[in-house]
Amino acid sequence: MKKLKYLLLKLFSKKNIHTKPMNTADTISKKSFYEFKLKSLDGKEIDFNQYRGKKILIVNTASECGYTPQYAELQELHETHGKKVTILGFPANNFGGQEPGSNEEIGAFCQKNFGVTFQLFSKSSVLPPDQNPLYQWLTQPSLNGWNAEAPSWNFCKYLVDENGQLLKFYSAAVSPLSEEVLKEIG
């Protein structure tokens, strides 16, 4: 049933992709991506400085969503393209209460069902009013230089380039293994 639900979502969902305009003075990030320090799923502080020089795919995740099978695609991307892109997952309960679990439950679910080894962060909100600081940066042009697109559902994706500049937004309907994503990763 979950596979059918996922296939129907993929079939009928709109594939929105927003791309950063050509570099101008107004499209340069006002705050550096590398300034962030956020808690991992197991409570350790992760310094984003360690991601310098790497492309980063940021995804808001949920365990009870029609798009949850994208965890498998994200894991495959991590395993096959991990030298080119780092995947950061942000569990959130913003859409339909589809991430009700604790950090421990989320970690166990992801490991058992998808063998997730990419970095997952502590459950947080990806929307205002209690939006986590990274998602504030991702969704406010005054901080990232151009993008105002907030997640509209679970499994929306943001691609950050090797210089810490926000490059792309992909809607939930865009597979992490899609031609669009793989082309940008290189």
Each predicted region: which residue ranges?
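Short hydrophobic helices that act as membrane-entry/anchoring signals
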Residues: M1-I17
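N-terminal "domain-start" segment that seeds a small globular fold
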Residues: S13-N49, P133
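Amphipathic alpha-helical repeat scaffolds
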Residues: S40, N60-E64
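Conserved helix-turn-beta segment immediately C-terminal to the redox Cys motif
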Residues: K54-K55, E64, T68-N93, C110-F114
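Thiol-based oxidoreductase modules, predominantly thioredoxin-like and allied folds used
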Residues: N60, K84-S102, T117-P128
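Short, internal strand/loop/helix patches
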Residues: E104-S152
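Thiol-/selenol-based redox modules, centered on thioredoxin-like
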Residues: P133-Q136, Q140-G186
